[in-house]
Design a protein with these regions (language model features):
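N-terminal presequence-like segments and the immediate start of the first folded domain
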Residues: 1-53, 60-73, 79-126
Length: 126
């Protein structure tokens, strides 16, 4: 049965969606922007910093459900400029040093709120 996930440790949704949903032992996060828990985006943040903040938001949501980054099965990454891939990839790799999940990374026209990156994840709790 589907259940809605909401934690104060990650930014609130900026639209008509949930931070995450679960069904059985699967957790599906919404795309996480590089917003602080209070919803702020630093205009001067680098792609590295934005990637880290987005992944910290993913981590906070997963931890609220008893999961961790090592439980992530798949991520989807949206970049507003694919030329930032190397900088993104270096920061991303620090969160998944062993047994990284499957991943898709694509360039999109724009990311909400003027961010450079948005990351969603699917994880399993056991």
């Amino acid at each position: 049965m589907k259940r809605i996930v909401n934690t104060d440790d990650a930014p609130a949704a900026v639209g008509a969606y949930s931070q995450a949903t679960t069904n059985g032992d699967l957790v599906f996060t919404a795309g996480q922007l590089p917003l602080t828990a209070d919803g702020e985006l630093r205009d001067d943040a680098s792609v590295d910093e934005q990637t880290r903040q987005s992944l910290e938001n993913v981590r906070a949501i997963l931890e609220s459900e008893g999961a961790s980054m090592s439980d992530v099965l798949k991520t989807t990454v949206f970049l507003d400029d694919i030329d930032d891939f190397e900088e993104f990839n270096e920061a991303y790799g620090e969160f998944f040093e062993e047994e990284p999940p499957a991943r898709s990374a694509v360039e999109v026209g724009r990311v909400p709120k003027g961010a450079a990156v948005e990351i969603e994840a699917v994880a399993v709790t056991e």
